[in-house]
Regions:
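Active-site neighborhoods and metal-handling regions in enzymes and metal-associated proteins
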Residues: 1-391
Length: 391
């Protein structure tokens, strides 16, 4: 996996005339270096983060790593490529990066970066004397698209950990339980089962009875999702839209289901699930290598009677890997031309998450992860829809 990822990055760098990548994003650093590290609060992922520098003519990346307790010590990166941490939010850290790049990057070599801190922007002319850096997404995005067998295995393991932890949380649902209690139980069990990091603040959102009764303003006038978990106590009959993600060895799970406190589901709510299932089945029927994002979006819209079965500020589906949501993102404001021109390769992974809504039901949303194959797909998600489904 380490060697394959490096080869893909360097081949794409050669194609685009890029001498060096400077990577700050956690997911990009994981992909380029194989490094993973424990993290409980995803909101602190920018604190003491590693930085990677990938050179087009070096088979190993350089990693500037704060080796905290519990960090992955089984690095495939050679010892002479592992350096003390850089704190690029500060001028001192940027000065150290400037010296490192001067030593590593050939004079005049083009550099691409995935993000720039304020301190990096102030020193941009010194950091990148050959000219403004290009966007590293043009290299990292295509490299990450097709998953290796090892990467699929890591994502599958992350999903199994997530599902086992989620099952314990679902069994604990009862009136009087707080949303934060659910988060605590999930995170504790996930780490006991071998999770490396907690990727997002767990969502156990209690859905309003109508679109306009949620008391949260949105620019689209539609449902607000996600809302932060609080100490709110659950009530009998509450409909919860759930969304959680952890990593295993740097690769993400993505879990979403709709639950009901008390497990009593009305006929209208069962009907919501059945329509959601029809939409998912229609999308899966056209999912295979060679299909496009547009094919899946049109199948979903047709199955939903001509309207989009996803929230306007989100998407019908997205990729997954070292980030919980990666390209492609289907049905966004990138537009129909983007969707129709994005062709699925075999080995790509996709998270499908259609949404159906009818006032008075709490709606229905779930997530399904698949691997694209030449003639269809292989399912990764393995979790029941209970209490929904009449059969």
């Amino acid at each position: 996996m380490y060697r394959e990822c490096g080869d893909r990055l360097r081949n794409l760098m050669r194609d685009r005339g890029i001498a060096a990548l400077v990577l700050l994003g956690n997911g990009n650093v994981v992909y380029a270096t194989g490094v993973s590290w424990p993290l409980l609060d995803a909101g602190l992922s920018h604190v003491e983060r590693p930085v990677a520098v990938v050179l087009v003519d070096d088979p190993h990346p350089h990693v500037f790593m704060p080796l905290r307790e519990g960090s992955n010590s089984h690095l495939e990166v050679p010892a002479d490529h592992v350096h003390p941490p850089l704190y690029l939010e500060f001028d001192e850290g940027v000065e150290r990066l400037e010296r490192a790049l001067a030593d590593l990057v050939p004079a005049g070599g083009a550099v691409a970066v995935d993000e720039l801190t304020g301190a990096m922007r102030r020193a941009q002319a010194r950091l990148f004397p050959a000219g403004p850096p290009s966007d590293a997404a043009q290299v990292v995005g295509p490299a990450k698209l097709v998953k290796t067998p090892d990467q699929v295995s890591c994502i599958r393991k992350a999903c199994r950990i997530t599902e086992e932890a989620a099952a314990e949380v679902q069994r604990s649902l009862a009136p009087g339980v707080r949303q934060v209690d659910l988060s605590a139980a999930f995170v504790r069990r996930a780490f006991e089962l071998g999770a490396t990091a907690n990727m997002l603040e767990a969502i156990w959102q209690v859905m309003p009875t109508t679109r306009v009764s949620g008391n949260v303003w949105t620019t689209t006038g539609d449902l607000a999702l996600p809302l932060l978990t609080t100490e709110r106590e659950l009530l009998d009959g509450d409909v919860l839209w759930t969304d959680v993600s952890i990593t295993y060895q740097g690769y993400c799970s993505d879990f979403g289901r709709t639950w009901v406190v008390g497990d009593r589901v009305t006929d209208r709510q069962h009907a919501q699930f059945e329509r959601w299932r029809e939409i998912l089945d229609a999308v899966l029927a056209v999912t295979k290598a060679g299909a496009t994002c547009g094919d899946l979006a049109r199948a979903a819209i047709a199955a939903n009677g001509g309207t989009k079965p996803w929230l306007p500020h989100f998407y019908l589906g997205h990729g997954i890997g070292t980030n919980a949501a990666e390209m492609p993102m289907i049905g966004t404001d990138l537009g129909a031309e983007f969707d129709d021109n994005f062709v699925f390769p075999a080995g790509m992974m996709l998270v499908l998450e259609p949404v159906v809504w009818e006032d008075g039901t709490g709606g229905y949303r779930s997530e399904e992860i698949v691997v694209i194959t030449d003639d269809g797909y292989q399912s990764i998600t393995d979790y029941p829809y209970a209490p929904y489904g009449r059969n």
